[in-house]
């Protein structure tokens, strides 16, 4: 396995890819690496602990299942779409820049040339794949003006592309400013004491975060884009449901959630409660499908704020990302999908693969297998 170089900063996906071998070794005492990579069980248990084949009679919508395209960085657009169609997936979330990059979406070219945009869109249409969301995860409130300006422009261009495509959902991060006007790096503040931290947090929201997103939401609204779905992610000011709702209250109903439960599992959130709460408030705009496995021995020793920053640290980490079904079983995912149906979620389930053991195509296939089976169980139909 290639060791991560200290001379450069890898992307999260590069890091996770490089950690696969270490993770497999670290978990060998818990489960064999072969079992870690096999198809997860989709056996649904009743409360009595027996297999259930009963179907619900609720008039629930068949929520489409799709995938976020950074899972396939080495495939051309045509190759990726053929693979996605082969998995029987129905929708895609496409990265337009920022951290996800734009491997399959030459944003500026598509905006500049209507003919190119038409050809690009037809590739999806020909395979009956819906473009359900565009993603431009970045940090438009970064204290470095060049970074902030770049990411803000990517957001604006993504809005313009969404308008042309008729896409209503743009996925991203809230961003994180510095802690003062003179800071040069972001400062993620989660606790108000000692007092200077509380002052920094108040300054971030009042002077940077809320003003930027008010303007950004207005721009989106003017271009017929009404759903900005924020991933609740550590190192950004919106990192849990409470901070998401705080920004929504301050900015408006354009702000909603990209409910990526992989970041909420380790925070101790109940996924069904989160979905119900956000859904009842009309704030559920997108759903990343990604799992997290918790290493309880390390949680017991170190707590949950215990992440690996190098491959050498991974065996001591408290959690890491997995494909759907490899951190939590089919019963949990059935409850999650049921919750989305119960609140009338009108988006799609977007598989995001950041599993360090299962490469992109395999991780996506396994996640799709779980999600299609639990969806079929809930609807009383075949997967």
Provide a role label for each language-model segment.
Residues 74-84, 150-159, 269-277, 333-335:
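Short, acidic/polar
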């Amino acid at each position: 396995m290639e060791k991560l170089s200290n001379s450069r900063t890898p992307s999260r996906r590069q890091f996770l890819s490089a950690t696969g071998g270490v993770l497999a070794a670290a978990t060998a005492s818990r489960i064999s690496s072969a079992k870690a990579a096999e198809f997860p069980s989709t056996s649904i248990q009743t409360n009595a602990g027996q297999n259930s084949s009963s179907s619900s009679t609720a008039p629930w919508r068949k929520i489409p299942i799709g995938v976020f395209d950074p899972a396939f960085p080495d495939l051309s657009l045509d190759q990726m779409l053929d693979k996605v169609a082969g998995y029987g997936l129905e929708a895609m979330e496409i990265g337009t820049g920022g951290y996800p990059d734009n491997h399959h979406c030459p944003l500026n070219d598509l905006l500049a040339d209507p003919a190119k945009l038409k050809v690009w869109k037809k590739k999806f249409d020909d395979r009956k794949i819906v473009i359900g969301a565009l993603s431009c995860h970045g940090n438009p409130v970064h204290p470095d003006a060049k970074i902030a300006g770049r990411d803000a422009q990517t957001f604006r261009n993504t809005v313009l592309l969404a308008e042309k495509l008729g896409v209503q959902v743009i996925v991203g991060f809230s961003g994180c400013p510095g802690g003062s006007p003179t800071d040069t790096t972001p400062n993620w503040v989660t606790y108000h004491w000692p007092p200077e931290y509380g002052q920094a947090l108040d300054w971030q929201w009042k002077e940077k975060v809320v003003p930027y997103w008010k303007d950004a939401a207005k721009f989106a609204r003017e271009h017929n884009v009404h759903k900005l779905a924020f991933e609740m992610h550590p190192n950004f000011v919106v990192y849990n449901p409470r901070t998401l709702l705080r920004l929504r209250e301050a900015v408006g109903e354009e702000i909603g959630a990209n409910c990526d439960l992989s970041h909420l599992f380790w925070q101790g959130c109940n996924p069904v409660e989160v979905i119900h709460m956000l859904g009842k408030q009309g704030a559920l705009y997108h759903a990343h499908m990604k799992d997290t496995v918790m290493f309880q021995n390390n949680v017991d020793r170190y707590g949950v704020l215990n992440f690996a920053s190098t491959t050498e640290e991974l065996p001591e980490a408290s959690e890491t990302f997995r494909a759907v079904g490899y951190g939590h079983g089919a019963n949990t995912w059935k409850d999650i999908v049921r919750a989305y149906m119960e609140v009338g979620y009108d988006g799609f389930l977007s598989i995001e693969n950041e599993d360090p053991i299962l490469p992109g195509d395999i991780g996506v296939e396994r996640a799709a297998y779980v999600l299609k089976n639990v969806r079929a169980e809930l609807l009383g139909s075949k997967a």
